[in-house]
Amino acid sequence: MAVPFLSSSLQLTPTSPILFTKVTPTPIIHNHRSTCTIPTKPRLRLLRRSAVAGTAVSDQTEGGGDVLLNPEEEKRVEVADYDWTEEWYPLYLTKNVPEDAPLGLTVYDRQIVLYKDGEGTLRCYEDRCPHRLAKLSEGQLIDGRLECLYHGWQFEGEGKCVKIPQLPASAKIPKAACVKTYEVKDSQGVVWVWMSTKTPPNPEKLPWFENFARPGFFDISTTHELPYDHSILLENLMDPAHVPISHDRTDFTAKREDAQPLVFEVTERSNRGFAGTWGREKEGGKGSNLLRFDAPCVLQNNREFEGKDGVKNYFSGLFLCRPTGQGKSMLIVRFGVTKRSPLVSVLPQWFWHQNACKVFEQDMGFLSSQNEVLMKEKVPTKDLYLNLKSSDTWVAEYRKWMDKVGHGMPYHFGHRTISLPKVPPVVEHAPAGLIAALSASYPAKGGIGTMHAPNLANRYFRHIIHCRSCSNVIKSFELWKNILSATAVALTALAILVVSRQWKAVLLGSAALCSAAAYTCLRAINLNTNNFIRTHRRL
C-alpha cells in the first residue's frame, strides 16, 4: 500500500554504496512440480533449474511474453552470506515510547521489552524474567528499574538483577539472575535494535536518511500494526500501480482514470538491496521518481522538485517495516518535505493519521488473503504471480533479493526459492492456546475483556495505542463530549423551569448548540477509531 499522496512524488537521495558480500555455493531451489523445498548440490543445480525453466517460460509467455516479466532471465540463483540477526530493525518512534511503563515488542518471533530508565536512557531486554519466565513487559518501572510484577525482581542497566524481595538479607543475588540485553539506538526520531547477541553492533548498517537531516525538513510520522507478513507489506509499499485503483479518491492524487502503464529502470542491485527509477508512460516514462530498498526492511521513495521561486525542494516517503512474526508486521511511515503545503499546516495531525489508517484498511483484505494463499500453496512467487513489466518490476526485484538472502532468515518466500517456518503460525502465536496468547499480548496484559482484547483488524489496536498524540486527542474529544452533553441536559432542564419565553428560547438554543458540538466530538472519536468500510458501486 503506497499512500496516495506519496505515490505520485517519489524519489531517491544519494546514499553510500552497497557492498557485495561473499557468495555461498548452495542455494535452495524449489521445484514447482512439488510442494517441498529441495536442497540441491552445486553440480545438480543447473539441471534442476533448467527443468523448472522450460515449463515456466512456455506456460507464462504464451500470449503474453511481451508484457510479462521474464521469470527466467537469470541462469542461476545467487546466494549471499546473510544473518537476519546482524541487522538494525526499527522498533518505535522515539516520541511515542512510554515514559512510565515498559513496552513489549517483537522482531520475528523474538519477544523484547523496551523502556526508559531513570536517566531517560533507552534499555532493551529479552521479554522474559529469568525467575519463572513471566513477561517483563507486564511489569512496572520503579526508580528507573524494570520490575517483574510476578515476584518483584528488579533489573537495571545491562540486565543486572538488583533486587529479589524473597532473598534473605545476607544472601547475594545469583549471577544467573540477569536478563539478555539488546543494543538500541535513537536515530533521527526512531528507535532501532540490533538483534544479534553474538556479533557487536555494526554502526555502518544503521540507516541514515539525508533528507530528514536537511534544515527545515517537516514530516508526519505514524505507526501501524498490520495483520500480514512484512514481505507482503513491502511488496505493497513498492507497488505504485495499485494506488489509482485501490485508493481511488482517497485524496486528490489518486484517481482510477489515471491508472496506466509505468516505466521502470533498475539502476542498482546488490546483496543489500536494490534501487531504481520509475515514471508514467504518458509522461514519457521519465524516471523522476526514485525508489531504494535497503536490507532488511527499509524502503525509500524520494523526489526532488523545483518550486516557483526556483528553490530546489525535497520530498521523502520513508517506510520502516518490522517483521513481528508470521502473518504480522509493524510499519513506521514518515512523509517529509522541505516545503510544507498550506493544507498540512491548517489540518490537525490526527486528520492525516486517520487518513493513513484508511489507506491501510483499503488494502487490508487483499494483503491478508494474499498472505493466506502463500502459506497454503508453499511455492515460490514465480509459480503464483503474473508480474507485468509495466507494473510489477519492484515486486519481482524484491522477491529475487529474497532468493539471495532468504536462507539467512527465519523463513522466506522468494521468486524461485522458499524456506518454510519451523512451526505453524498458530503454534508460534498461541502455543498454549488462543486465550493464553491474547492474555499475554500487548496491550491486554492479562485482561481479555471486549475493551482490551487486541484485534489487529481494529484501527484502535493497529494505530491509536501506538500513537501518543492520537490517544491524547481521543481523550480530549471524549472529555469535551461528556462536558457538552451534560451542559446540554442542564440547559434543557433549566429551560423547562424558567417562565420567560425569551429565556426558554435562549436556553434551548444553547442546549442545541452544545448537543451539536457533543455530536461533532463523537464523530471525531469515531473517525479516529472506526475502520473504513469500502462501498462498492457500479461504474
UniProtKB/Swiss-Prot annotation:
Keywords: 2Fe-2S, Acetylation, Chloroplast, Iron, Iron-sulfur, Membrane, Metal-binding, Plastid, Plastid inner membrane, Protein transport, Transit peptide, Transmembrane, Transmembrane helix, Transport. Signal peptide: none annotated. The keyword Metal-binding applies. Its cofactor is [2Fe-2S] cluster. It is found in: Plastid, Chloroplast inner membrane. Binds 1 [2Fe-2S] cluster per subunit. Residues 1-50 form a transit peptide. The keyword Transcription regulation does not apply. PANTHER family: IRON-SULFUR DOMAIN CONTAINING PROTEIN, PROTEIN TIC 55, CHLOROPLASTIC. This is Protein TIC 55, chloroplastic. It comes from Arabidopsis thaliana.
